[in-house]
């Protein structure tokens, strides 16, 4: 029902966004990521969305079910190639992030959680979801979305000039400052 919330317990060992270093909030370095899931029609499948806070680089992956296992696999798959550029990950309090400790250990990163019902604390990701929704509308089923579809949308978004980046593209900003690409 509208206004109801999940009462099935809380995530264990969650670290509040208040503990997150100030440099994350100020977008001073590359490697601070925000994560969320976009739910498809009938709440079956989902898209895991990751956005790097400084460069606004967007990563997407479809999961068949919005379970902690599926989301963990998607996050580690998406961020493994950029492991040198992963310092923090910030999520909401969804049950799909129950394996946050395993994700943090695998990627050698710190995992933080925003306050409940405080979407503005992860504004970059909420904005990115709005951009992704231009390609995958809210009422659309994710049944027919392929890996190629998500890669095309990532390519379009990451090559779109952004005013907040002085009209550079996210891929340009990320490439200029990436540890993984510059080593």
PLM regions: where:
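Mobile-element integrase/transposase regions
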Residues: 1-47
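Mobile genetic element proteins and their domesticated derivatives, centered on retroelements
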Residues: 36, 50, 56, 75, ...
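Active-site beta-loop-alpha junctions of metal-dependent nucleic acid enzymes
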Residues: 39-43, 60-83
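Coil-to-beta-strand transition motifs
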Residues: 43-45, 53-58
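Short small-residue beta-strand/loop micro-motif enriched in glycine and branched aliphatics
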Residues: 56-61, 113, 138-140
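RNase H-like two-metal-ion nuclease catalytic core shared by retroviral integrases
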Residues: 91-93, 98-101, 106, 113-134, ...
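C-terminal domain-tail junction helix/linker
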Residues: 138-183
């Amino acid at each position: 029902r509208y206004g109801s919330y999940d009462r099935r317990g809380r995530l264990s060992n969650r670290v509040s966004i208040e503990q997150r270093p100030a440099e994350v909030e100020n977008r001073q370095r590359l490697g601070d990521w925000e994560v969320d899931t976009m739910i498809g029609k009938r709440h079956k499948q989902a898209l895991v969305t990751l956005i790097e806070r400084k460069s606004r680089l967007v990563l997407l992956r479809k999961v068949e079910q919005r379970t902690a296992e599926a989301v963990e696999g998607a996050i580690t798959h998406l961020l493994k190639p950029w492991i040198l550029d992963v310092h923090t990950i910030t999520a909401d309090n969804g049950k799909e992030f129950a394996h946050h400790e395993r994700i943090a250990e695998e990627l050698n990163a710190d995992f933080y959680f925003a306050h409940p019902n405080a979407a503005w604390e992860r504004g970059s990701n909420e904005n990115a979801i709005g951009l992704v929704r231009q390609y995958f509308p809210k009422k659309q089923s994710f049944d027919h979305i392929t890996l190629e579809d998500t890669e095309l949308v990532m390519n379009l978004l990451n090559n779109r000039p952004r005013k907040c980046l002085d009209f550079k593209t996210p891929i340009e900003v990320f490439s200029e400052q990436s540890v993984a690409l510059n080593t």
